UniProtKB/Swiss-Prot annotation:
Pfam families (alphabetical): Arg_tRNA_synt_N, DALR_1, tRNA-synt_1d
Motif 'HIGH' region, residue range(s) on this chain: 122-132
Annotated source species: Salmonella arizonae (strain ATCC BAA-731 / CDC346-86 / RSK2980)
Reactions performed catalytically: tRNA(Arg) + L-arginine + ATP = L-arginyl-tRNA(Arg) + AMP + diphosphate
PROSITE patterns registered for this protein in UniProt: AA_TRNA_LIGASE_I (PS00178)
Lineage: Bacteria, Pseudomonadati, Pseudomonadota, Gammaproteobacteria, Enterobacterales
Quaternary assembly: Monomer.
Annotated protein name in UniProt: Arginine--tRNA ligase
Length: 577
């Protein structure tokens, strides 16, 4: 149930009846403060201006046409023309009952779309590092949310599996007589990569051989393709371990690397030339874009094929967008790539639109994100100044969580402790990131993320177990509880119920904007409201069975909402802490 959408529809009809244009925006929002009701319609200002009347006068006319019987107990005009809506406790009670009767908690499904989500994108022959964390977990939270809402989601792991580095790596492996790359661990490959690069830079003969190998690889030579495949296989096997540890839904089947688009590039260049979009300039093939200016103020030239015939990332990204629309039949494409790539993507997509490869009706959205910083406010590094490997970060998270959990549960069996430490440690790293607005940089701080107070994973996981503990203490007759009515008579009951019923609205925002922090803030709010409700509205010692059962049902919906909400974020819940 989307109460915001229901009220928007009702207010919009009343505004039109009061003389507003048919496309008027009611601007119904969740109220920021309790005294302003549960929802507020703020659209009178803009519409009144167009109609040449005072907003308050319009609001009064709207109220004469606004029928919220059975939904609101009170509707009032505030300030210059805001309409405050207070939901009826009987309506809240009925909606709580309906939410509990459904596995989906009453969340409706919008029109089904095919949505491609591009995220993670590590490089072959390199271990994943902390720079891959944000794209991987924010993208996965978006995927989980969209799938829960019923969309057909195609995960696209755009791995860096093509380019000159493969000639270099194959040449170096050969030089070391270690063609059987399949037996090497990725840690070895990291060393190989460094050594290969050193030789490539210092030994012209080796560099020449590496360049020849690239040509052979690109021309489809069976031996070189086999060597390349081994490098990709080792990398993706290692990455899968990291994905599984992170509780991320990516698998090997989701890999759509740069190599996939390689055969399409000559055709793209030829087509852009034929359409008059690409021209020869100083030996290279270039698209000049009026939308972007160079330092001189002239249209910026975007190279799509170099003088030597090589292609660029832009060419690949053009082919990639075209493929996602024409072959995958995407209705919408989301890219979880850091903010530094914004101009590059905008240029590629401008070319895509001009060439007619993807119509304007299909959104290409760059859901960019900021950087992960250390406590010093600089990019997060090891003490020695190197890049932090993702596996090392997760090992440390597990170790810290293990100590924390053991301290609080000295008698817990070892296997249970390990399971709990894993949920808390990995959850803490993910939630610390997901709870921040993705567009900003954030400070990575172990102490904050593992704290049991504040908007953290341990607090949220504990809040969930606290609700479950009510049911462990109660001697519950499941049948009697299922048929018991919900009674909303206290303010704290009404506040908790109203917030629980805003779950669908929260999911809708996350799906539209790709902002998991909105879900984190919502769940934290729910946990806080439950805490106040638990303190002031006795559950097990309620004055009678009817009130007890009603409050148990509110607790039940709280537990289900927390669990489902955390699941859309990829955060594991536990039964006890």
């Amino acid at each position: 149930m989307n109460i915001q959408a229901l009220l928007s529809e009702k207010v919009s009809q009343a505004m039109i009846a009061a003389g507003a244009p048919a496309d008027c925006e009611p601007q119904v929002r969740q109220s920021a403060k309790v005294q302003f009701g549960d929802y507020q319609a703020n659209g009178m200002m803009a519409v009144a201006k167009k109609l040449g009347m005072a907003p308050r006068q319009l609001a009064e006319q709207v109220l004469t046409h606004l029928d919220l019987s059975g939904i609101a107990s009170k509707v009032e005009i505030a300030g210059p023309g805001f309409i405050n809506i207070f939901l009826d406790p009987a309506f809240l009670a009925e909606q709580v009952q309906q939410a509990l009767a459904s596995d989906r908690l009453g969340v409706s499904q919008p029109a089904r779309q095919t949505i491609v989500v591009d995220y993670s994108a590590p490089n072959v022959a390199k271990e994943m590092h902390v720079g891959h964390l944000r794209s991987t977990i924010i993208g996965d939270a978006a995927v989980r949310t969209l799938e829960f809402l019923g969309h057909h989601v195609i995960r696209a792991n755009h791995v860096g599996d093509w380019g000159t580095q493969f000639g270099m790596l194959i040449a170096w492996l050969e030089k070391q007589q270690q063609e059987n790359a399949g037996e090497m661990a990725l840690a070895d490959l990291e060393g190989f990569y460094r050594d290969a690069k050193k030789h490539y830079d210092e030994d012209e003969g080796f560099a020449e051989r590496a360049r020849n190998y690239v040509v052979k690889l690109q021309s489809g030579d069976a031996y070189f393709r086999e060597m390349w495949r081994k490098l990709v296989d080792i990398t993706m096997t290692q990455n899968q371990i990291t994905y599984d540890r992170l509780n991320v839904t990516l698998t090997r089947d989701d890999v759509m690397g740069e190599s996939l688009y390689n055969p399409m590039l000559p055709g793209i260049v030829a087509d852009l030339k034929a359409k008059g979009l690409a021209v020869e300039s100083e030996g290279a093939t270039v698209v000049f874009l009026d939308e972007f200016k160079n330092k001189e103020g002239d249209p910026m030239g975007v190279i799509i094929q170099k003088k030597d015939g090589g292609y660029l990332y832009t060419t690949t990204d053009i082919a990639c967008a075209k493929y996602r629309y024409e072959t995958l039949h995407a209705d919408r494409v989301l890219y979880y790539i850091d903010s530094r790539q914004h101009q590059h993507l905008m240029q590629a997509w401008t070319i895509v639109r001009k060439a007619g490869y993807v119509p304007d009706s299909v959104p290409l959205e760059h859901h960019m994100f900021g950087m992960m910083l250390g406590k010093d406010g600089k990019p997060f590094k090891t003490r020695a100044g190197g890049t932090v490997k993702l596996a090392d970060l997760l090992d440390e998270a597990l170790e810290r969580a293990r100590r924390l959990v053991a301290e609080k549960n000295p008698d817990m069996p070892a296997d249970e402790l390990e399971k709990l430490a894993n949920a808390v440690g990995i959850g803490a790293v993910k939630y610390a990131d997901l709870s921040k607005n993705r567009t900003t940089d954030y400070i990575f701080d172990w102490d904050n993320m593992l704290a049991f107070e504040g908007n953290t994973a341990p607090y949220m996981q504990y809040a969930y177990t606290r609700v479950l503990s009510v049911f462990r203490k109660a001697d519950i007759d499941e049948q009697a509880l299922a048929s018991a009515p919900v009674i909303i008579s206290e303010d704290r009951e009404a506040q908790l119920a109203a917030r629980l019923l805003q779950f669908e609205e929260t999911l809708t925002v996350v799906a539209r904007e790709g902002t998991p922090h909105v879900m984190c803030a919502y769940l934290y709010d729910v946990a806080g409201l439950f805490s106040g409700f638990y303190e002031h509205c006795p559950i097990l010692s309620a004055e009678n069975d009817a009130v007890r059962n009603s409050r148990l049902k509110l607790a039940q919906l709280t537990a289900k909402t927390l669990k489902l909400g955390l699941d859309t974020l990829g955060i594991e819940t536990v039964e006890r802490m």
